[in-house]
Amino acid sequence: MEDKNSVIVFKNVSFQYQSDASFTLKDVSFNIPKGQWTSIVGHNGSGKSTIAKLMIGIEKVKSGEIFYNNQAITDDNFEKLRKDIGIVFQNPDNQFVGSIVKYDVAFGLENHAVPHDEMHRRVSEALEQVDMLERADYEPNALSGGQKQRVAIASVLALNPSVIILDEATSMLDPDARQNLLDLVRKVKSEHNITIISITHDLSEAMEADHVIVMNKGTVYKEGTATEIFDHAEELTTIGLDLPFPIKINQMLGHQTSFLTYEGLVDQL
């Protein structure tokens, strides 16, 4: 297939974890626009985390196809294509493999046999981009959860990916650390033209996105821009999603527009 504007395409993808189990994904089709921030949202059991597993090859489709840069992903080409995709998981403690920060960032580069001089340069550049270079010699237990997630992002950036997947990467952070991490992701996306895919149950995080896919019971429930999705905010509550605080307040005030950021709410008040 030919779609120059999409980096990842799901075409009629179905998936079940066991042959005698019900399908977790049912005939799912969507496009991930290149260079944009796509948020895939849904409650627990909606299928969103399974999508992430299929994208990085932890699981394989039962039927349908997944395309990466117009190439159908197969067993023969997967490892080559997978190198373009980085992922940051939910629990920062489960991602740290190095004894100190700089060794953790270097780990993936060692696996790719990157020469030592280039490795040193890439590690320093990646840590500088996430404001963690001064902590390059810190042990993991000296870092906060937000700082550990910054190191996880640095580890991904050092590999020069085209796509970064955030799989519930902010869910264990406090509100300030969460917002700081989202601000960092926005900066990284802008500076490197990286495609961001955030997998989340938090609609507040989806407000950051250019493109939103809402999953429910293994199917695509809604898809569109953040404005288009939140203009039908009440429908989202019927599938178990909690509306972001600014939208709740906006509705309580009787205003017409459903989509409203925190900054927009302050302006209205």
From Swiss-Prot:
One Pfam match: ABC_tran
Binding site for ATP: G42, H43, N44, G45, S46, G47, K48, S49
Membrane topology: Peripheral membrane protein
UniProt keyword annotation of Membrane present: yes
Localization per Swiss-Prot or TrEMBL: Cell membrane
Enzyme class: translocase
Entry-linked CDD domains: ABC_cobalt_CbiO_domain1 (cd03225)
Domain ABC transporter: 8-242
InterPro entries linked to this entry: AAA+_ATPase, ABC_transporter-like_ATP-bd, ABC_transporter-like_CS, ABC_transpr_CbiO/EcfA_su, ECF_ABC_transporter_ATP-bd, EcfA_1, P-loop_NTPase
A molecular function GO annotation: ATP hydrolysis activity
UniProt cross-references to PANTHER family, sorted A to Z: ENERGY-COUPLING FACTOR TRANSPORTER ATP-BINDING PROTEIN ECFA1, HEAVY METAL TRANSPORTER
Family: Belongs to the ABC transporter superfamily. Energy-coupling factor EcfA family.
Functional note: ATP-binding (A) component of a common energy-coupling factor (ECF) ABC-transporter complex. Unlike classic ABC transporters this ECF transporter provides the energy necessary to transport a number of different substrates.
Protein's name in the database: Energy-coupling factor transporter ATP-binding protein EcfA1
Organism, as annotated: Staphylococcus aureus (strain MRSA252)
